[in-house]
């Protein structure tokens, strides 16, 4: 039974040593035992934060075991793909080997990186010059992506003369229209608020132009990782014996997915370091290099661990949902197990994914704590300052998605054009795919960096609002007014236990 620990005067911000179940809005609707457990975790996390000042001069290596696991997996899989015995050549393998030649893959990847970099710079400049226009564009990025996929399916059906892709395209188009209607009804109020916080990051970018070099580093890392994995994948397709091809191709694809998350989160940490140094007023002559050094050395293990953990938890949640649906169809006993055990497991996975995400990496960049310590510290800061009400009204994921779409289209088009010029239609298809993958990572380094800046400013403001009061007092007042409005409208706070 859930007991709503309610209070009529839940404060906007709770001091570190005054935390209680009744004055933290995040704990109001939780059961008593769980609320007390979370309260103890919040207090322990605050004690850890008080022991470690922001941006210490010396940092210990964190989560080394996961860094070693990522290094061993990368070296093992890539070396295996290079050293596996080749299969005997056949008549059909000549055409595939021509398309997947290393020089051709490197050429299209380089072209895709150039196109993605140009698009990333354009997105960043637009966010700096016209933040409200970018926020409106981000609002409609999801319906636009769905509609774009619908056109791809319809075009494929028309070119191949098959009905199934056309039906899928029509269904996707209908889903895109539904997304557009829901977006217009429920999320338009978030545009001006997101644009307001984007203006803060724009001011930071003006005084810290090293942000653009961080974007370039992200695009370069995306190009490097994609090229390495595609070369290994090409050899597995063309030269490796059929017996080991399936295992090796699957391993390379999984490694590419994990590594792409690592590159994306590494760029996120670099941006968090840049904005965190600005917020705390730390003078650093080489801001970007300092943030990159932290993200690529002492905190790289936390980046690898966080990327793997989020991916694993989301995968478990998907599997649990599938098992739950099967259980409801099979028998009453399985349906009972599905609705109780698996239902709670899915809720736990959703809560864990909310904690173990990009927000946790902010404390890794600021304080150099481990990933689990950072996740707990971030949750405690957000709970004590009621930042969860601000997070609900932001379009952070839409900003990253918008830049991902733009950079993917630009990178895919340039890479496909290069492939067409070098090797015809087949090379254009391969080049377009590689360009899209590089563009997705580049998008995370562009407007994804703006999202990282907003997240860092919010977490730092939750811990200490004074720097934001001095630099942007109007933004501080708007943040507090939004939290106050949500607290007054929260039903759990209007009841007595």
Predicted regions located by residue number:
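Eukaryotic membrane transport/trafficking proteins
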Residues: 3-497
